[in-house]
Amino acid sequence: MSLMQMDSLLSLPTAELVSIADKTRRELVPPKLELCGIINAKSGLCSEDCKFCAQSSRHKAEISTYSLKDKAEIVRAAQIAKETGAERLGIVTSGNRLTEQELDVLAQATQEINDKVGIAVCGSLGALTKNELGILKDAGLSRYHHNIETSPRFYSQIVSTHSFQQRIDTIDSAKAVGMEVCSGGIIGMGETWQDRIAMANVLKELDVDSVPINFLIPIQGTAMASLETISCNDAIRTIALFRIILGHKTIRLAAGRESVLKDFQGMAFMAGANGMMIGGYLTVGGRLVEEDHRLVKEINSLWTE
């Protein structure tokens, strides 16, 4: 889609933009809302300086910090995620790399989840090498999560300890070993609309399978604590633009959906979203699972009418 076409879309009233996005979803995406859950398997003490993240050791956010959970805890989290209706469990660890021992524990946990729980396993484990990713792929890790976070232009404004290209390199490595890829980012960090469009276009070029959209939750102690959350209207328009640009890809609502969208979460699924994270996030909680189940039932019913 050309820049002129994108500018034309940006000028549309929200209702018209949402209508185009919903038509795109109905034509290209199966009418079923996808659910996933995560486990924060290793928390805090990260050496990276991502301005938005409470887990960076360079910030003063008050969070729980702990080393990698054992295999049994991770497998149990997969069972709980399955019981809440999630089709996937994302195992998430803080930090940019894994030790050899951590990699071994995660490979064993992944294999046991596949063998005994029966839920798809994803990993968000940092900038792993192709060899490390191959080990996890052989253990049954089906999808790798590695957000690009924002546009290439804006990336250096939020992180200085690694580059945008390094994110791309890890995604390419995951694809090279045969994994699916989940990659998106955070909206509301001070980026422009053109940055959001550029981010969506990069994800389209990378041909990722799933795109999580987070909305910044300004956490005390982080470098972005003083930022205001974006408006519900801007959030809805962003979701719609991503659907129009990304076509048939899964667009998954993640952190911040409750605080930004509030009572309008249902509208996000009329604006192009077709998936969401359930059961809480890394350092902040989510809605009650029962409330999300009611929303899922209503959306699935509406989509199949």
Residue map of PLM features:
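A general structural detector for well-ordered alpha-helical segments in enzyme core domains, enriched
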Residues: 74-77, 105-113, 132, 166-173, ...
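Conserved, mostly hydrophobic/aromatic
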Residues: 21, 50, 91, 146, ...
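Auxiliary Fe-S-binding modules of radical SAM enzymes
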Residues: 1-15, 75, 204-305
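Core AdoMet radical
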Residues: 58-77, 81-171, 179-184, 209-214, ...
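Flexible, acidic/Gly-rich N-terminal and inter-domain linker regions that tether
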Residues: 1-52
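Catalytic cores of alpha/beta
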Residues: 129-138, 189-204, 259-271
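Conserved strand-turn element in the central/C-terminal portion of the radical SAM core barrel
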Residues: 95-99, 170-194, 213-228, 249-260
